[in-house]
UniProtKB/Swiss-Prot annotation:
Description of how the protein assembles with itself and partners: F-type ATPases have 2 components, F(1) - the catalytic core - and F(0) - the membrane proton channel. F(1) has five subunits: alpha(3), beta(3), gamma(1), delta(1), epsilon(1). F(0) has three main subunits: a(1), b(2) and c(10-14). The alpha and beta chains form an alternating ring which encloses part of the gamma chain. F(1) is attached to F(0) by a central stalk formed by the gamma and epsilon chains, while a peripheral stalk is formed by the delta and b chains.
SUPFAM superfamilies: N-terminal domain of the delta subunit of the F1F0-ATP synthase
Predominant localisation class: membrane
Annotated membrane topology: Peripheral membrane protein
Record localization: Cell inner membrane
InterPro entries to which the protein is assigned, alphabetical: ATP_synth_OSCP/delta_N_sf, ATPase_OSCP/dsu
Protein name: ATP synthase subunit delta
Molecular function in Gene Ontology: proton-transporting ATP synthase activity, rotational mechanism
Keyword Membrane: yes
Length: 180
């Protein structure tokens, strides 16, 4: 089984358990802390990826690092993935968990690049329009793209909506040269 499929399955199982137990917020917080700690610690990354370190040793080490900080369900999850020799996929499982949680709550992440900084009112209108378009709640990441001549580009999952001036000029060029 590929690591992506396994990560998604483990993440889905953890989310199911968290929802059934009513501890989704606590598990969210736990996973954020685990993710940040692993990202900041080269030693933890090496330990998690090492095939020479046994699963129960990895579980004990993680429990020692996060002693008294994690919810019981999160601790059981860590123990499970260590015993199943999947601890090296923990960062991917955290990302899959976040994606599944957002999906289940009807939230979608959108990347908006603009040539100039959008005013607050413009950003609100754009987010409201995207929410109407997608039928979901929108979490927008706004960024400046100095390569754009003007306008905006919006990335929703695998879909790109290109409202940039460059794109409009390219479309105009194609239309004008098609008639010749």
């Amino acid at each position: 089984m590929s690591s992506a499929i396994a990560s998604r399955r483990y993440a889905a199982a953890l989310l199911d358990v968290a929802e059934d137990s009513g501890v989704v917020e606590q598990v969210d917080t736990d996973l954020e802390m685990i993710s940040a700690t692993i990202a900041d610690s080269h030693d933890l990354v090496v330990m998690l990826k090492s095939p020479l370190i046994k699963g129960d040793t990895k579980a004990k080490a993680l429990k020692a690092v996060f002693h008294g900080m994690l919810n019981e369900k999160t601790l059981l999850f860590i123990d499970l993935i260590c015993r199943k020799k999947r601890a090296d996929h923990l960062p991917q499982m955290v990302e899959e968990y976040k994606a599944l949680r957002d999906e289940r709550s009807g939230l979608i992440n959108v990347d908006v690049n603009s040539a100039v900084k959008l005013e607050d009112e413009q950003a609100r209108e754009l987010i409201n329009s995207l929410a109407t378009y997608t039928g979901k709640k929108v979490r927008a990441r706004l960024a400046l793209d100095e390569k754009l001549l003007g306008g905006v580009t919006v990335k929703i999952g695998d879909t790109i909506i290109d409202g940039s001036v460059r794109h409009q000029l390219d479309m105009l060029r194609v239309a004008l040269t098609a008639d010749v």
